[in-house]
Amino acid sequence: MQQLQNVIETAFERRADITPANVDTVTREAVKQVISLLDSGALRVAEKIDGQWVTHQWLKKAVLLSFRINDNQVIDGAESRYFDKVPMKFADYDEARFQKEGFRVVPPAAVRQGAFIARNTVLMPSYVNIGAYVDEGTMVDTWATVGSCAQIGKNVHLSGGVGIGGVLEPLQANPTIIEDNCFIGARSEVVEGVIVEEGSVISMGVYLGQSTKIYDRETGEVHYGRVPAGSVVVSGNLPSKDGKYSLYCAVIVKKVDAKTRGKVGINELLRTID
């Protein structure tokens, strides 16, 4: 694996000079191998090690290199044709392979090659970009988007129209991460490498980026780039120092543990916020 990483790192340093016409065989095969490993879930761009999320930057670099070495090509779809550098993940799947891998894909959901989809996942008409990892039992609801290299945990619900940001455009240092057992409400956006920790509930229409203040009303603490585990979060505003205006923020209205969350439905958690 170290040899593979070295090839990617070296090629990335000279990426501006690489084209589909001049890329060498070693680099092409290395990138192809990484994309295949990401696609199968054998590798992932980020993983939790000893309680901390670690981003494997070289894998992200391989994803970026794939755009340098591949030409656009015609891609067949059910109702249309496409023209892109990245093939679709399910282009060669037959019924037996879908049965074996054990997830559902509702048309016209689109998943790019290099994204991993785990068992018991349901993809409604949605979009999952290259390098993303979607773990077991997760629902990606209608018109939700999972950005490049985003990491989605087990038993997550991404509601209709949710946007999970990617790392490729604009280029971000770390992927956006939604940990296990989280609920992300409809039309919410989580971007710029924000981490939503395990068991959190994000209400409808909440926008979270690195500069978003995440205000805990119980403690008065303000978080940036991280929603603490077990948080119930809604949209809000905080006043300016001079009191003349207010700016958008996200508000942690309560904390819940797994036991409470198991007994109380998501809707009830969001309704009783006073």
From Swiss-Prot:
The lineage of its organism: Bacteria, Pseudomonadati, Pseudomonadota, Gammaproteobacteria, Enterobacterales. This is 2,3,4,5-tetrahydropyridine-2,6-dicarboxylate N-succinyltransferase. InterPro entries: DapD_Trfase_Hexpep_rpt_fam, Hexapep, Hexapep_transf_CS, THP_succinylTrfase_dom1, THP_succinylTrfase_N_sf, Trimer_LpxA-like_sf. Homotrimer. Substrate binds at residues 104, 141. It comes from Salmonella paratyphi C (strain RKS4594). Belongs to the transferase hexapeptide repeat family. Its EC number is 2.3.1.117. Its main location: cytoplasm. PROSITE patterns: HEXAPEP_TRANSFERASES (PS00101).
